Amino acid sequence: MASSLVSSFQPRSAFLGDRNVFKVSSTPFAQVGYSSKTIECKESRIGKQPIAVPSNVTIALEGQDLKVKGPLGELALTYPREVELTKEESGFLRVKKTVETRRANQMHGLFRTLTDNMVVGVSKGFEKKLILVGVGYRATVDGKELVLNLGFSHPVKMQIPDSLKVKVEENTRITVSGYDKSEIGQFAATVRKWRPPEPYKGKGVKYSDEIVRRKEGKAGKKK
């Protein structure tokens, strides 16, 4: 009886089978900070894309400092040490990682996008459109000020930066344009912030491509 029990006993590893096998990835890993953990450093799909430079755009690179000049204006950007910018013989720009870390991977895609926005901005420009929805809501441009009537007891006056152009059509359609995409977005967001669109009647300031999720009022729920 004892011998049969001994013969039927098997180590735990025999029951686990393939679960004891550890698979090792061939993808390179990098150490992060002082942590004992390792992470997989994946290549950024956005970061590895080349940047085309039009003939009317001038690129000046000194160390980690980049200056881009075009017919619409001039922009500057300083790169972190985790990434660097190189110019190929073909004329394309490439953003490359200098180290293999999680932060470098994040900076890779981010600074490729920022650099591309600079090149497009000084050559073609960007614009952002807003729409005023509401009875009595209107906008006008008075010199270097955007004047908004949004139902408050007094009009809202916003100073227009020198690098931006603001145009108003039909008193309710605002177009903000310029060569600095981040500045355009910030100015447009400030305009919208004065009266964000409310979900019941849709009144407020919204982006032209914004979809406002509508809610049913209390009166509609009782029916």
UniProtKB/Swiss-Prot annotation:
InterPro entries attached to this UniProt entry: Ribosomal_uL6-like, Ribosomal_uL6-like_a/b-dom_sf, Ribosomal_uL6_a/b-dom, Ribosomal_uL6_bac-type, Ribosomal_uL6_CS
Pfam families named among the record's database cross-references: Ribosomal_L6 (PF00347)
Annotated SUPFAM superfamilies: Ribosomal protein L6
Keyword annotations: Chloroplast, Plastid, Ribonucleoprotein, Ribosomal protein, RNA-binding, rRNA-binding, Transit peptide
Keyword rRNA-binding: yes
Transit sequence range: 1-41
Superkingdom of source: Eukaryota
Entry GO MF terms: mRNA binding; rRNA binding; structural constituent of ribosome
Subunit structure comment from the entry: Part of the 50S ribosomal subunit.
HAMAP family according to UniProt: Ribosomal_uL6_B
Name under which the protein is recorded: Large ribosomal subunit protein uL6c
Species: Arabidopsis thaliana (Mouse-ear cress)
Origin organism lineage: Eukaryota, Viridiplantae, Streptophyta, Embryophyta, Tracheophyta
